[in-house]
Curated annotation (Swiss-Prot):
TM region(s), chain numbering: none
Miscellaneous remark of the record: The structure of the 7Fe-V-9S-C-homocitryl cluster is assumed to be analogous to the 7Fe-Mo-9S-C-homocitryl cluster.
EC number: 1.18.6.1
Protein name, as recorded: Nitrogenase vanadium-iron protein alpha chain
Gene Ontology terms describing biological process: nitrogen fixation
Subunit comment: Hexamer of two alpha, two beta, and two delta chains.
Keyword Oxidoreductase among UniProt keywords: yes
Domain of life: Bacteria
Amino acid sequence: GGVLKDTIQMIHGPLGCAYDTWHTKRYPTDNGHFNMKYVWSTDMKESHVVFGGEKRLEKSMHEAFDEMPDIKRMIVYTTCPTALIGDDIKAVAKKVMKDRPDVDVFTVECPGFSGVSQSKGHHVLNIGWINEKVETMEKEITSEYTMNFIGDFNIQGDTQLLQTYWDRLGIQVVAHFTGNGTYDDLRCMHQAQLNVVNCARSSGYIANELKKRYGIPRLDIDSWGFNYMAEGIRKICAFFGIEEKGEELIAEEYAKWKPKLDWYK
C-alpha cells in the first residue's frame, strides 16, 4: 500500500513500528513523491496499550486528514501491540468516514506475528482489498485494450518506464497494483480485460481472485531484462491480437539500446 501516490499510510502502533515502511525502499511517484516524504504513526505509548488505543487512532486519523487537506484516502495498519490489545481499527475507520463523508479508509489487520513471512501480509491486503474495495467505483475506459498491471512497485521508476510501452501499444492500464498507483484506480480493477502479473509472490493472490470472481484472465510476465521484457510484450500483445504493434515496439527498443548492450560483450 505504501507505494500509492495519493494515500495516507497510517501505522497504528508505537513509533518504532513505522520504521520498516516505504522509506526503506525506492518508490518514486509522478506527483512529487508524496508517499516518500511522510510517515504517519499513532505513536502509541504505554498508557495507550494499557487503556486502549482506539481514541488515539481516531485522533491521529483526523489530524492526518487535517494536515493533508488534498488527500482523501487512507490505509490503516495494525501492529503487534494494537492487535494484542484488540483495538477495533475497522470500527474506528467507519466512524471517521461517517464524520468525513468525502474520505475513504481501508484497514489492514495483519500484525507482525500473523505469519512466518512477509507473504502473509501481502495475502491479507490482497484479499481484503478485493472483498471490500473492488467494484466500489467505475472509471472511464478509453481504449479497446485494458489491463491491470499487478505486482510492480515502481522501484527506481520501472512502472513509469513500462507505462510508456503500454501507451505506445494503445493499452489502457485500469489500475497499477501498486507502483505509482492511486487508491481509486484500484477500486476499478474489475473493469480490466486482463491481469498482467509481474511479481506473483506479492500479488498473485488478487489476480487469482479477480479471475475467480470476474473471469479476468491472469498472465504472468517478467519485466527485468531485455529478453524477458520482449517475451512479456509478445504475450500481452498476443492476448489482445496486436502482435504487429508489439514487434514494432521491441524492434525500436532493441535498436535504441543495442549499441550500449554490445559494449558489455
